[in-house]
Amino acid sequence: MAKIEEARSLSQQSQQVTLSPKIPSPIVTTALPVSAPMAEPHAPSPAVVASTSASVPVAPISFVPRRRETLPFEDSIVSAEYPDVDSPTPPKWYSDIKREQLQSLRVPAAVEEHLNKIQSGMNRCKEKALKHVIPNAADFQMINEGIHRAFFLDLTAMTIRKKFLLHNNRGLPAIFRFDVVDYPWYLKEDAAELYIKWWSKDTDPSLFRGIRLGRAKNSRIGRDSTVDSLDPKYAGRRHGNFFGNGHLRNGQWWPTQLCAVRDGAHSATVAGICGKSGVGAYSCLMSGGSYPNIDKGGEVWYYGTESDDPSHPTDSTQHLIENSKSHQPVRLLRAAKMTTQGANDYRPAEGMRYDGLYEVAGYEIKNLAKQVHLFHLVRLPDQGPIRNSGPEVRPTPEELAAYEKAKIEKKFLA
């Protein structure tokens, strides 16, 4: 509950909403090798990590629908393809729905309420912009709340079409691409994320869609514990073997690493560095470990993995070495349980968050016998700020509440 209230408080702090992103100034990278900004300990020791456990929320979480067991054919995901948000075009399944099919469709009141927040807020902003009046924080907050709740609405593909939500001039693209209103950067990011989800006909509101949930050990009935796993039948699975942002948005959030793998943000269910030999690293995750990373937001000092061969680094470490030579940026995800030196203002409240692209500016070998490398990562300019505070904070209060409900339901799985 404390984390949900804290996130809600952070999301409502700003009464003055900036209409364009505060882009961090370019950081001059350093040549190899590079040293950390503080003395390193002779032996690695885990840093003290703030507790990530949360009590059962008191606030109502009834808005989070139950996990879908089956989907009707008309609401099945078409494929894992995703749109070009710079030139959005409604998907075929959306365009193929005829008006006559929508006439008798009844949209549930709870769904209508939150979708109307998005559209009413957009209409108010557009009316003001046409009168050369700058929309205020309350106008944007209405849209913000509507979008955040929309991720968890139990709706259908027909409802998305009936409400014109993928239309370029009336739907979500009007926020991130086409409209006369200069919306805040974080609204554009979240509208684009929701658009990508719905464009693929992914209407499942569950955080754990496409995941087979493991079950706790129950000695009374003789059942061993099982772990979560990817559902091989899930059509929306994306893969993370690419450089750059791809379909991912700044601040996109997942409750677990497996969910990030499902959506193609990362490629390994356990490892922190993902890549390909001879090509480089695609993504790296700041999580727990024996070596405390150093996190300054725009700059990170990130440890590679220990090698059993004193003459050669691990494959994961070698991937990042290759990035330092090719200058291919790496996707960086931060986990709530990451191990860092000192206090960390960039840690998500729960789960893991995508924080954009970083260049591997340099590295040095900290332990030759174990081939432990320390990499200097520098966040690329012209990206939105890291979403750790303010109205743009991720995870959102809705995401935290949905995660709490999922944990409660999982605890009582038969």
Label the predicted regions.
Residues 1-99, 399-414:
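Ser/Thr-rich, low-complexity intrinsically disordered regulatory regions
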Residues 343-413:
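Compact mixed alphabeta submodule
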